[in-house]
Amino acid sequence: VTTADARCDVLVVGSGGAGMSAAIAAREAGASVIVITKSALGASNTGRAQGGIQAAIGADDTTEDHFEDTLSAGHDDGDPALVRTLVEGGPDAIAWLASIGVPFTHDDGDLRVIRCGGARRPRLLQAGERTGAEMVQALRAAVRASGAEVRESTSLEALEPAGDGWRALTRAKDGSTTPITASVVVLAAGGGLGGEAARIGEKSTNHPDATPEVLEMALALGAEGRDLDSWQRHPTGAVWPAGLAGYALPETTRSYGATLHDAAGERFVDELAPRDVVADAIIRVVEEGRGSAAPDGTMGAWLDTTAIDRDNGPGFTAERLAYVHNRYLKQGVDITKERVLVYPVLHYRNGGLVIDESGRTTLARLYAAGEITGGVHGTNRLMGNSLLDTVVFGRIAGSAAAREALA
């Protein structure tokens, strides 16, 4: 069944942090907006992000330091103009998120910042210990309040140029299809690494909806891509218990003092090195026969989480890492009393669609933001930069798309 055509100024595909930020910005700029999302509004990888969001707001920090850290961690493969846009937009992104209700954590009246891998200074802000989930809650409410039309359980089936815009064919959960004609489209459907992991038989940290068909559709239309085969593995994916397969212990676990050890108990890497350095070191330890085996034979390295309370005092883990602590407790493991086995797990696509500083792809009237894009993170992303990316470039793309649609 095909229902009547719908029309809008801006069609946003995807409803993670980037899609919701884009929709809000486009509405603020006066455009009519339709958001389509495969399941519920906000169901995305954004909501799974535990660690935090980076922004240079500290008195001893600068956007220049953040810029250099981001480029360096990405092996200088990032687009400097995009990296500059990301980091310079950081402080304003935090202020905006706070204004829509994200409850950032404070210590003694100041925003708490901690240091994470690849960063020279404490720069990671948190909203409790599930920053992404708090962001999604605030963004979802802001989208609903903005007047954007949201079509849940609706996927993008096809996209084609139509006059001075685009015609999208969408499919609802009941199988009915609806064409949507839009002056401008913003793609914010993620990198789809969950689907890629399934294809090759690996686990991933991704949301079940994280499949790459929208990225592939844009590439098939002729949009230029970059670094598409650059996939990031989160260093500390849970190996055991089996019920935690695909779960990654957040990098803050290591920021707070957890250390990595081989089977002999020797440390083998700087735990706060960039993600690919730590992940490669764990893989190398296992390949060299220095790893340890879980009861089912799966290999990994030890993450000594017991060091956190030893270094910071009893109760620190239960307070600062309650979500991690409780997930393991439900599986019969107390991470304050025993080490856990970890091994890198597929996490993030570093590359994607080529965009400029306004979020424009190489196709007319087609914008993109978030993990579906490339160039922002080079070939290795810093922890906390993905949430920042969704907000900075989501807002930029939404505003620019609205301006073009209304011109």
Regions found by a protein language model. Name each.
Residues 5-8, 175-184, 362-363:
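Core beta-strand elements of the Rossmann-like FAD/NAD(P) dinucleotide-binding domain
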Residues 55-86:
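Glycine-rich active-site loop/strand segments that organize a redox cofactor
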Residues 100-176, 184, 188-192, 197, ...:
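Conserved redox-cofactor binding core of oxidoreductases
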